[in-house]
Amino acid sequence: MTIDAALADKIRRTPKAELHVHIEGTLEPELIFRLAQRNHVNLPYPSVEALRAAYAFTDLQSFLDIYYAGASVLLTEEDFFDMTMDYVKRAVADNVRHAEIFFDPQTHTARGVPIGTVIDGISDALAQARTEYDFSSSLILCFLRHLSEEDAFATLEAALPYRDRFVGVGLDSSEKGNPPEKFARVFTRARELGLHLVAHAGEEGPAQYVTDALDILKVERIDHGVRSIDDAALIERLARERVALTVCPLSNQKLKVHPDLSEHPLKRMLDAGVAITLHSDDPAYFGGYMNANWEATFAALPLDAADAHKLARNSFEAAFLPPMQKAEFLAEVDHFWSATPTSPPATAPAA
């Protein structure tokens, strides 16, 4: 399926919010090698090309193995700053106006990197991005679900001196054997602290994990959530309660969650009234940032301009933004879609 040229242009230019991107997953091979040289880290790959070739993983676990290996080059505030600025430049080029960025402190503290180094480096880059690019952003601290809840508690407590730097907590890494209820107490603690709550659920795990994330963890947003399609009552609930799903199509394709994008359920869920949003997840590893995900999705599924407007709107509606700023972004989206033609203008007759 090909996209109409005018619609393709519009989905590239529409204002967007990115709500599901792991900052460590934006590490391109070139930057990994540059940081490895700067920090004298030996990589098990002889070249950038060899590292890129290793990105031929086939499932979530094989991806996570190389993901954590790539993160090993991140040691200083400057490293985290450079990684974040590289992402921001790509996001700005894709007309991302606001991003809520995941970071995994346990990946770094386990290697002896202080949590302050992680948060300061990322935060400094985002502060510069706000000034330099008018790029709105916030941070979400993610717990690694293959580790213990005690480790998550320790991470949350260690992050509290930086409480003003992040707006919420999330839950990522492998779902297998790590159900939402494993982290019930730490999510209760985060809620008491006034933090927003999100969680990965229903990617490789069942639809029941989505329900459990809502009922046990009390999350406000579901990351991935594509297995929700297996439960009609859950789909009705998501639509009724306006619970957003942060869907990552190229990630789903690469990890074989949905190998054929033409069979991806996001269009069916969108038509059912679910607040679907599109994001890049770990774009350096999955072959595409925001616009690549939008373009691949529209090429694979029967989506039109009204769907694109809805997807862009959903991304800002689901964002953890102050009401006035959210209203401004929504007005920007609505103006874009009402003011820009969705098909090429007719050619004027010759005089």
UniProtKB/Swiss-Prot annotation:
Molecular-function GO terms, alphabetical: adenine deaminase activity; zinc ion binding
CDD domains: ADA
Catalytic activity: adenine + H2O + H(+) = hypoxanthine + NH4(+)
Positions contributing to Zn(2+) binding: 20, 22, 200, 281
InterPro entries linked to this entry: A_deaminase_dom, ADE, Ado/ade_deaminase, Metal_Hydrolase
Binding of substrate, residues: 282
EC code: 3.5.4.2
Required cofactor names: Zn(2+)
Record keywords: Hydrolase, Metal-binding, Nucleotide metabolism, Zinc
Cofactor, how bound (note): Binds 1 zinc ion per subunit.
GO biological process terms, semicolon-separated: adenine catabolic process; hypoxanthine salvage; nucleotide metabolic process
Residues carrying the site annotation Important for catalytic activity: 224
Family per record: Belongs to the metallo-dependent hydrolases superfamily. Adenosine and AMP deaminases family. Adenine deaminase type 2 subfamily.
Primary role: Catalyzes the hydrolytic deamination of adenine to hypoxanthine. Plays an important role in the purine salvage pathway and in nitrogen catabolism.
Official protein name in the record: Adenine deaminase
